[in-house]
């Protein structure tokens, strides 16, 4: 697919793997956000950003959102009738299409998805962004420093609930946190491919 780029932030590998699969399917490049330059965005009509979820935030999404903020505001103004299609065309934004993917081990839980959207897309102009939730993998033995501390705290919070408050999802999460998990699945990128090729 011409003029498409997949930008990602990956710490343990799942986001990079999904980015590579998406790029392969779309016939484009995948590049880490550290290697990508903001000024190069103008060369692409379709931009996909993805990153792992940590403490409710999508890694480096704030940096990416700063890059595309003016585009999103213009698209929002167009959708709300504040500017015309001609105005949008003049801005060079009219054909640009963005999508976001988040990778984590608790993203099949609808409440977790909503929290993620609330935390990462607080402004009205951000809410238009399609966001896809992809299952990652987790290996507790690989964690160090702050990552280990965050996961230990999350585990303590769940285990600290009263027995009657612990949900089935909490039990699954405790198992993942204690034993690790490998949930990564290439088939889960299909909705992203469909979104970017429609």
What annotation goes with each model-predicted range?
Residues 3-25:
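N-terminal beta1-alpha1 ligand-phosphate binding loop
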Residues 23, 38-43, 126:
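Short loop/helix-cap segments at secondary-structure boundaries that form the rim of catalytic
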Residues 27-39:
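A short, well-structured beta->alpha microelement
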Residues 45-48, 97:
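Structural motif
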Residues 56-198:
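FMN-binding flavodoxin-like domain, especially the glycine-rich phosphate-binding loop
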Residues 1-3, 197-198:
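Short, Lys/Arg-enriched, disordered terminal segments
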Residues 52-53:
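Short glycine-/small-residue-rich Rossmann-like dinucleotide-binding loops
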Residues 4, 28-31, 98, 129:
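Hydrophobic anchor at the start of a short beta-strand
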């Amino acid at each position: 697919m011409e003029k498409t780029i997949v930008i990602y932030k990956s710490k343990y590998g799942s986001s990079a793997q999904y980015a590579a699969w998406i790029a392969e399917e779309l016939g484009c490049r995948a590049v880490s956000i550290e290697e990508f330059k903001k000024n190069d965005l103008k060369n692409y009509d379709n931009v996909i950003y993805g990153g792992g979820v940590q403490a409710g935030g999508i890694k480096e999404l704030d940096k990416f959102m700063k890059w595309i903020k003016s585009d999103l505001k213009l698209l929002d103004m167009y959708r709300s009738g504040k500017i015309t299609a001609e105005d949008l065309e003049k801005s060079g934004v009219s054909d640009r299409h963005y999508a976001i993917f988040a990778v984590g081990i608790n993203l099949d839980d609808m409440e977790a998805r909503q929290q993620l959207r609330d935390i990462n897309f607080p402004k009205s102009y951000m809410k238009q962004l399609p966001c896809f939730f992809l299952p990652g993998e987790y290996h507790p033995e690989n964690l160090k420093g702050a990552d280990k501390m965050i996961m230990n705290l999350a585990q303590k919070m769940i285990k600290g609930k009263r027995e009657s408050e612990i949900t089935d999802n909490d039990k699954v999460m405790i198992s993942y946190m204690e034993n690790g998990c490998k949930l990564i699945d290439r088939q889960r990128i299909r909705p992203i491919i469909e979104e970017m090729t429609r």
